[in-house]
Amino acid sequence: VDSTETFTQRAFLPPFANYQLDIAYDEMFTPEGQPRPNYQYLHQLLLELPATELRQRQHAADITFLNQGITFTVYGGSDGTERIFPYDLLPRIITSDEWATIEKGLTQRIIALNLFLKDIYHEAHILNDKIVPKALVYSCRYFRREMMGLRVPNDIYVSIAGIDLIRLSDGQFVVLEDNLRVPSGVSYMLANRQVMKHVFPRLFSRYDIRPIDHYGQALLATLRSLAPPNCTDPTIALLTPGVFNSAYFEHTFLARQMGIELVEGRDLLIHNNIVYMRTTGGLKRVDVIYRRIDDDFVDPLAFRPDSTLGVAGLLNAYRCGNVSLANAIGTGIADDKALYAYVPAIIRYYLKEDPILQNVETYLLTDKSQRNYVLEHLGELVVKAVGESGGYGMLIGPHSTQEQREQFRKRILVEPRNYIAQPTLSFSRAPCFLDGQVEPRHVDLRPYILYGKQVTIVPGGLTRVALRRGSLVVNSSQGGGSKDTWILYD
């Protein structure tokens, strides 16, 4: 009996009538069509519950998101408006053993990337030893010469990271992308959990799930650890671009969770290289800034002169050691998509260890032979712009038109440094409740890593879902959604 027949006999009853297995790893089912142990209760519950009840719960979740203002902004759309962040009712369930590997691998990776940043802005041993090409680092638009020789608190450049993982068909998690500048989405992870507890308490109480509610306090402790020398009780502020930013909900959410001030650039001023915040009681010194603004915009005197989002003189205050920034300026070189290809070598160089989490095979288009191969196989590969995020600047070969491939061919030939290519991967699919049916959709996972006095990884992360059938793009700006991620206790 083939796996499809077995699957049909045992599990293909409504609401699974449209559920089909393929070569991708399925989070709920084995290749033979059996529910995996961690999904057995959820599978049974879905067989028992009427579709009307599931629809009611999904509607209740949507209303909760709307009432709480849990939205994001899509730029450039026809409406250009705020939308509810699409939420799928069915949780993603990860075993404790799987999580233990993820946690170790992410800890190893964030430590190595911080050592790399410290090195390239000081002695540059890794460049002189030709492990990473100098040209790659110095040509990166996120490499900041202003950071050369500057010490940062505890030598930690990246205090807050979101690292994107996918699960391949063999069941292994691999790293797809490092987000080390201004990672976003953690508020949706926290909101998803609260909504799930509210709309599906029976399911939630049946599983032994590790909590994530302490993220806000863990983030606050991380920011406090960055206080300048001799500052025992730092004043911390979250610097937001303002209400029109797509992640503004997250900025307000996190500031509230931590009990810190939410400020815009116009609320801050610099005097004698010290940062002050305007308050109703007068000026108050600020010691640590959690910035949700990219390097280019933080200081119009140092970077983009047209920026109205930052604070004039902030870089000088930072260089004088009077204020700490999370993340440090210049971390973007470490999440450049071309530099990504060297992270396994970076881990081996600094830690003398093999990577616990593997990379995806990556073609560097500055290499002539690799470039020629990619140009001949554009219809099979994924091409990414090295400095873009959010699913922009990307060509998914199998889903592209001849015209799109020609556009990318021209761009690559003009600026090969600005692009990388990777195989089109069949990453895992998880069950989603869509239009009264349970169907599989591709998912990734973004765990959030904090690096203060130690590395802290809240057990879970944001599982993003490509809600369009067949789509591999999980970004909310491109029609993706999210679901609650459960890490089980042993």
Give a label for each model feature:
Residues 1-490:
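Preference for protein termini
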